[in-house]
């Protein structure tokens, strides 16, 4: 791996390790329409949470067009020294209604956005309290390419959080965040 952990770098946008089910596959292999797809339904509360805080679930989908070559492995470098250029272009989206505005990889995954004054679920609060307080919609556009040790990746994210309570919070009722990352690296196979 040549790059910092993505869930650290794009912390505000990660939906990290949700509990649920998904269907994935590849259609039209090695044709101009070669695509990978993933669709899923999740609890929407993060690591280790099997149940949602209300009756709403998280829905997520990703569609990847393998424009040149095969799908690129989920890695942050071209450690295989790929002999044939590969280029993937993808879009993804997720929607969720819960008391979480962000997630992290630990046992208390459900949390509020860093730096916001959105209300956070109090420790020991009764199950269902503040249930479905936030509506979160987000999307990502991604481009990845590998060729002879060279790895390129670009992600562009947008996330909209709507506070569905009627209280006046210092943080706006609706907030929209944009972010992204670009990575370019080379894995030095000849040195190893």
Where do the protein language model's features map onto the residues?
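Outer-membrane beta-barrel channels and translocator barrels
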Residues: 28-32, 68-70, 147-150, 189-191
């Amino acid at each position: 791996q040549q790059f910092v952990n993505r869930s650290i770098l794009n912390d505000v946008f990660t939906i990290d390790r949700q509990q649920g089910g998904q269907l994935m596959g590849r259609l039209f292999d090695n044709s101009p329409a070669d695509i990978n797809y993933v669709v899923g339904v999740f609890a929407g509360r993060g690591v280790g949470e099997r149940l949602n805080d209300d009756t709403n679930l998280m829905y997520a989908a990703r569609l990847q067009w393998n424009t040149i070559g095969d799908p690129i492995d989920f890695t942050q470098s071209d450690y295989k020294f790929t002999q044939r250029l590969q280029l993937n272009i993808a879009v993804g989206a997720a929607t969720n209604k819960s008391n979480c505005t962000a997630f992290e990889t630990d046992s208390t995954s459900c949390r509020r956005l860093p730096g916001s004054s959105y209300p956070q679920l109090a420790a020991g609060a009764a199950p269902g309290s503040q249930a479905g307080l936030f509506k979160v919609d987000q999307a990502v556009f991604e481009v990845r390419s590998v060729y002879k040790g060279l790895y390129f990746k670009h992600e562009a994210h947008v996330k909209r959080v709507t506070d569905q309570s009627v209280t006046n919070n210092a943080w706006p009722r609706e907030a929209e965040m944009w972010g992204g990352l670009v990575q370019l690296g080379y894995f030095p196979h000849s040195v190893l």
